[in-house]
């Protein structure tokens, strides 16, 4: 039994070293710039949006709660503390994305190609949005990082990865996932 405990302790410490090394590499890459940084909006309880959804009326949308707002602050703090250079922050027009961007970064621009296409109402927009996202990235020549605050479905489609709320997903300009960082809520 004692041998099993020793093996378990060694395994856990090696796992933590590997994880820390990977995280250090991710941070180094972020600090160099030239990355796409997708952020799934911070925690907003529930799933999807109500049937009466109106893009101009936040009361008809699923929104951040206090936990999501705190998570947004943690996202901003992560970028500041790690001195991650940013060219531009762009966001979906959905209120939960705008609020995440506003709290974490203050300044941002809205881009409709980052809007959700989760519901049947918006699913028809998926192909055009992905084309426009790729065109935008192709024309981006920033030396720092491009931050994209968006939705699960957009990130999943763009980089083939399923992010948690508030998760940071790093990709290159070819949308190859380079790493991810989870921000607790």
Where are these regions (language model features)?
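Sec/Tat signal peptide C-region and signal peptidase I cleavage site
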Residues: 16-20
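Sec-dependent signal peptide recognition
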Residues: 1-9
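Active-site-proximal alpha-helix that buttresses catalytic centers in soluble enzyme cores
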Residues: 21-112, 117-121, 161-185
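Glycine-rich phosphate-binding loop signature in dinucleotide/nucleotide-binding domains
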Residues: 82-84, 140-144
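Conserved nucleotide-cofactor-binding alpha/beta core module
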Residues: 125-127
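A short, acidic, amphipathic alpha-helical segment used as a generic capping/interface helix at domain edges
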Residues: 129-140
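Generic beta-sheet signal
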Residues: 34-36, 144-150
């Amino acid at each position: 039994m004692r041998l099993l405990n020793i093996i378990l302790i060694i395994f856990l410490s090696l796992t933590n070293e590997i994880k820390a090394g990977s995280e250090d590499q991710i941070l180094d890459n972020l600090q160099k710039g030239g990355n796409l940084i997708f952020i799934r909006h911070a925690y907003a309880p529930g799933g999807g949006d109500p049937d009466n959804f109106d893009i101009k009326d936040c009361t008809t949308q699923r929104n951040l709660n206090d936990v999501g707002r705190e998570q947004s602050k943690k996202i901003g703090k992560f970028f500041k503390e790690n001195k991650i250079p940013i060219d531009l922050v762009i966001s979906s027009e959905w209120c939960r994305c705008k609020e995440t961007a506003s709290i974490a970064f203050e300044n941002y621009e809205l881009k409709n190609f980052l809007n959700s296409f989760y519901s049947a109402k918006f699913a028809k927009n998926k192909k055009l949005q992905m084309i426009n996202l790729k065109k935008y990235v192709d024309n981006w020549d920033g030396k720092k990082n491009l931050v994209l605050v968006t939705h699960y479905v957009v990130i999943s489609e763009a980089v083939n990865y399923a992010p948690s709320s508030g998760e940071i997903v790093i990709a290159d300009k070819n949308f190859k996932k380079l790493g991810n960082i989870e921000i607790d809520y």
